[in-house]
Amino acid sequence: MAIHLPCLPMMKILSYLDAYSLLQAAQVNKDWNELASSDVLWRKLCQKRWLYCDMDTLQLQGKETWKQFFIDRIWQERAKFRAKAKDFTYKEIPLMCGLFGYACYISGCGLTRKGQDKSVVCMVNSKNTISTWDVHKSVITWKSPEQPASIKLLTTLPEMHIAVTVDIQSTIKLWDCHNREALATNNLKSPCKSLKAVFTKDGPIVLIGDTLGNIHIFRIPDLYLISTVNVLPYGFDGIYCSPQKKWVLLSKKHPHILPKVFYMSSFLRTSEFSAPVSTVLKLSLYERVFWTPRREDRITLMSRSGFPQVKMFETYDIKLEEFGNKRIVKGKLIASFELQCHKVNPQRFGVSDKNVIVCSTESSLLLFDINGLRLKTFQYCPEMIVKLSVDPLHVIVICNTGSMDVYAWEERSLLLRKCYRLHIERPLPLYGFIYKAACDDVSIIQLITDELSLSSLTSYALNICS
């Protein structure tokens, strides 16, 4: 017998379901199908998974409903999971194009139902030029004129297909990677140390940290200076933004400097905030930071302390509280655990959206919950793990042989599933190492450096079409 409920209570019940359960509910009868296919429900799921989902996103993707957008985007994300090693083509960029110092994806998306879109990587080389490389065709698609000063920092904003560079003279340039000349230019008086370009709810911005401990916020696309704030007594090591860019953590790896988490809007809305709003996380000698994917307010830090040394993992929830006209930020420690370095010495880590910490030692890949319960171990001896790349979908383990293992986070469990291994086609140089690894939906890149500081960029391009 079919169950009949008024629309509002039924919609309330359906709003608690995940996508898989909504699809099942839609099969009950015609009325349930109509409610379970509601744009309100599917837009909520899209916003939870991909954050900035609005009507512009829907029009850009050419979809009629949020349900169709969700299903197609999931299909796109899982292209690498469905693939096998034989479905990838190994490519290497010619060394005649120059020696590479940086490589960042500038393409916004990969696969579509209609076929295979381009993966495009933006690079800086030793000739002080910026260029873009079509990963699938292995060709240079754009190149800037040679710059008057060496470029020391590069970042990209794939959503807008732009790149931002900073040279040794602290000149900032914004590029659309189509025109030969930069779209906008600005300068700082002090040397730059860190660079980030992000989308916020107030619009796209560039964040730059200098050696004096200042953070400078510039507007995109004209590089107008929005604000400059001194946040630390020394230059900070990195700029770590939360998934929706509500928060930004700034810190320096120093025993007497504690990490600070700032409310991003307090940097951007200078007329509304007389000073930045922040909180201090009371742990020193942090080594790495990772914001929990698809959760705006949770961050995990790995630090070291004591003798014999231990590695600490601490997870905080960051909250904004209002008292009248005053707003304050609080960081609440919700979980922690430690590992003895003489037994397990993690070097790198990441976090899944289900609060699972994955970390790598030289010889193993380990999974813990945020309280320290070990969930799984993947052994790598006699190989050595040299890089670990973690995002909401993938975990990529890179070994000293140049081979890489691709894992996928399970949708309905806490564990990882190993998908396949990709091999490099030529041996690494005797003293070569993998400087950087990154991926998008349809490709994986590696920046390899040898003993002479010569670099090459290799890629694995997925050649599966719909």
UniProtKB/Swiss-Prot annotation:
One of its GO terms (biological process) is protein ubiquitination. Its main location: cytoplasm. GO terms for cellular component: cytoplasm; cytosol; endoplasmic reticulum; nucleus. The keyword Cytoplasm applies. Residues 1-45 form the F-box domain. Induction: Up-regulated in response to bacterial lipopolysaccharides (LPS). InterPro entries: F-box-like_dom_sf, F-box_dom, F-box_SCF_Substrate_Recog, WD40/YVTN_repeat-like_dom_sf, WD40_repeat_dom_sf. Specifically expressed in oocytes from follicles of the medullary region of the ovary. Pathway: Protein modification; protein ubiquitination. Disulfide bonds: none annotated. WD repeats lie at residues 101-143, 146-185, 187-228, 339-379, 381-419. Part of an SCF (SKP1-CUL1-F-box protein) E3 ubiquitin-protein ligase complex. Interacts with KAT7 and SKP1. Substrate-recognition component of an SCF (SKP1-CUL1-F-box protein)-type E3 ubiquitin ligase complex. Promotes KAT7 ubiquitination and subsequent degradation in collaboration with MAP2K1 kinase, leading to reduced histone H3K14 acetylation and increased cell proliferation. PANTHER family: EXPRESSED SEQUENCE C85627-RELATED, F-BOX ONLY PROTEIN 3. This is F-box/WD repeat-containing protein 15. It comes from Mus musculus (Mouse).
